[in-house]
Swiss-Prot record:
Residues noted as binding Ca(2+) 1 in the record, renumbered to the chain: E30, E267, D272, E275
Tissue expression per record: Plasma.
UniProt binding sites for Cu cation: H27
Record-given protein name: Albumin
GO cellular component assignments: blood microparticle; cytoplasm
Binding site for Zn(2+): H91, H270, D272
Length: 607
């Protein structure tokens, strides 16, 4: 990259980076401005999401009261922006409403202490009390009951969905949740007319649930990236992702969008849901206004209403890679001015490297592209301090190859394991692997994470080679972030803490490299995990699997160096025991009689 060209790029980037694409007009009343922009229904939905994400234990009706109060106040401010309190910040208005809740101390304990603080510390305090794993009842869809509720009051049904999802997922991307709530109501509009409501509803609800959980995990990773590694981490991720999706867009267009996309996510992660949704709509408009310069795939998205438009843009397929792109080596390895360009503006130069690499490689995972950029940066830091920098960095692309080979080999190996054993067997192999790596982690967390990791086989292994790596690596990033979020709340393993905090892009390789934790002191054998009753016979298959996998984790915590053969023997005995007693006439009597024998045979097998 010649010096004159690079300076032009730097000036363009600096301008785009500072300007972004949003109008940033000031308004006398922020709440009136957002109410006017968003409309009453979206305003109410977003306020309900915000309160539900902060006050996760409050009943729905209490939240509805808070939403009504704030909506009426917003309408007052729309009518007269100079009305008392209309000039207050949204944080102040929301915080004041939260602090009015009579049962705040009783229900949330020291969260009530937040109310003694001033903004912005008060909002930060509320954010810190969000619970990623709240103790809430499992939702079980009953088609007839749900259809009756839907027909009785569609608006309330929509609100109840927002409330139930938001309080279970306190970082859910709010404008996306509005989109899913509308889709959810649409499913009931269709299926409640059907003769067999359950046959129509349940598969659609299950499919939507998977999408909603994936959306929640993606946003939780974005928020964790900002919280733990700063905006730069999310910007780098977004540059790689958008460069893959919009490979014909130029670097300055990509960085403009990245700057404001980061602002949108930062707002939502920070609880500023009204600003987040409003800015996201503006960003979607900008992208559609400039679609010809960005991607041929956007047209279908841009004809949709605002919530569907934003969702469609986020999910849009990658555009075709432009033909005749020059080789990467020309600007980033062969050019003798690389160090000059890098030292003049490191982030711009590395950003352009990431952009150029990503747009040429839609088949790579974002996390892999970020590892390539990180190692390229480390190489330049080393080489640019030497007497002959060019001789040092000229072969850098050969040195980067291992970062692509490592995940490809790992995926091949794990997909072979999945194809041999199926999803449940693959999950069990991962339970053994991860319990040995981090036996201090709680049993429910190890089971949850291993089951989720095991689903990567079903999700990704059947995909074509060009899609396997992004599917696998990016999915694993979400699951490992969940482990890190849960572990941060109650840290028990130094190894897990190290992998979670040292490097966002190297989390997966760090966990892959962990071995048996030799510092762990095995726990005593606990009979309760091998004591069962007749109720296990009527459990759904998934819950039966979880019972067995819980026992497997506990076995490993008792005997982390147990051989695969020992574990196989114990688990086969366990399955035979359950099958025998579930087939018996007196099931409970069988469990009482045979249970102690299972405990004895298990202890003998592990001796």
């Amino acid at each position: 990259m010649k010096w004159v060209t690079f300076i032009s790029l730097l000036l363009l980037f600096s301008s785009a980076y500072s300007r972004g694409v949003f109008r940033r007009d000031t308004h006398k009343s922020e709440i009136a401005h957002r109410f006017n922009d968003l409309g009453e229904e979206n305003f109410q939905g977003l306020v309900l999401i915000a309160f539900s994400q902060y006050l996760q234990q409050c009943p729905f009706d209490e939240h509805v009261k808070l939403v009504k109060e704030l909506t009426e106040f917003a309408k007052t401010c729309v009518a007269d922006e100079s009305h008392a309190g209309c000039d207050k910040s949204l944080h102040t208005l929301f915080g004041d409403e939260l602090c009015k809740v009579a049962t705040l101390r009783e229900t949330y304990g020291d969260m009530a202490d937040c109310c003694e603080k001033q903004e912005p510390e008060r909002n930060e305090c509320f954010l810190n009390h969000k619970d990623d794993s709240p103790d809430l009842p499992k939702l079980k869809p009953e088609p007839d009951t749900l259809c009756a509720e839907f027909k009785a009051d569609e608006k309330k049904f929509w609100g109840k969905y927002l409330y139930e999802v938001a309080r279970r997922h306190p970082y859910f991307y709010a404008p996306e949740l509005l989109y899913y709530a509308n889709k959810y109501n649409g499913v009931f509009q269709e299926c409640c007319q059907a003769e067999d409501k359950g046959a129509c509803l349940l598969p659609k609800i299950d499919a939507m649930r998977e999408k909603v959980l994936a959306s929640s995990a993606r946003q939780r990773l974005r928020c964790a990236s900002i919280q733990k590694f700063g905006e730069r981490a999310l910007k780098a991720w977004s540059v790689a992702r958008l460069s893959q999706k919009f490979p014909k867009a130029d670097f300055t267009d990509v960085t403009k969008i990245v700057t404001d996309l980061t602002k949108v996510h930062k707002e939502c992660c920070h609880g500023d849901l009204l600003e987040c949704a409003d800015d996201r709509a503006d960003l979607a408009k900008y992208i559609c206004d400039h679609q010809d310069a960005l991607s041929s795939k956007l047209k279908e998205c841009c004809d949709k209403p605002v919530l569907e438009k934003s969702h469609c843009i986020a999910e849009v397929d990658k555009d075709a890679v432009p033909e005749n792109l020059p080789p990467l080596t020309a600007d980033f390895a062969e050019d003798k001015e690389v160090c000059k360009n890098y030292q003049e503006a490191k982030d711009v130069f590395l950003g352009s490297f990431l952009y150029e690499y990503s747009r040429r490689h839609p088949e790579y995972a974002v996390s892999v592209l970020l590892r390539l950029a990180k190692e390229y940066e480390a190489t330049l830091e080393d080489c640019c301090a030497k007497e002959d920098p060019h001789a040092c960095y000229a072969t850098v692309f050969d040195k980067l190859k291992h970062l692509v080979d490592e995940p490809q080999n790992l995926i091949k190996k794990n997909c072979e394991l999945f194809e041999k054993h199926g999803e449940y067997g693959f999950q069990n192999a991962l339970i053994v692997r991860y319990t040995r790596k981090a036996p201090q982690v709680s049993t429910p967390t190890l089971v949850e994470i291993s089951r989720s990791l095991g689903k990567v086989g079903t999700k990704c292994c059947a995909k074509p080679e060009s899609e396997r790596m992004p599917c696998t690596e990016d999915y694993l990033s979400l699951i490992l972030n969940r482990l890190c979020v849960l572990h941060e709340k109650t840290p028990v393993s130094e190894k897990v803490t190290k992998c979670c905090t040292e490097s966002l892009v190297n989390r997966r390789p760090c966990f892959s490299d962990l071995t048996l934790d030799e510092t762990y002191v095995p726990k005593p054998f606990d009979e309760k995990f091998f004591t069962f009753h007749a109720d296990i016979c009527t459990l759904p298959d998934t819950e039966k699997q979880i019972k067995k996998q819980t026992a497997l984790v506990e076995l490993l915590k008792h005997k982390p160096k147990a051989t695969d053969e020992q574990l196989k023997t114990v688990m086969e005995n366990f399955v035979a025991f359950v099958d025998k007693c579930c087939a018996a006439d007196d099931k409970e009597g069988c469990f009482v009689l045979e249970g102690p024998k299972l405990v004895a045979s298990t202890q003998a097998a592990l001796a």
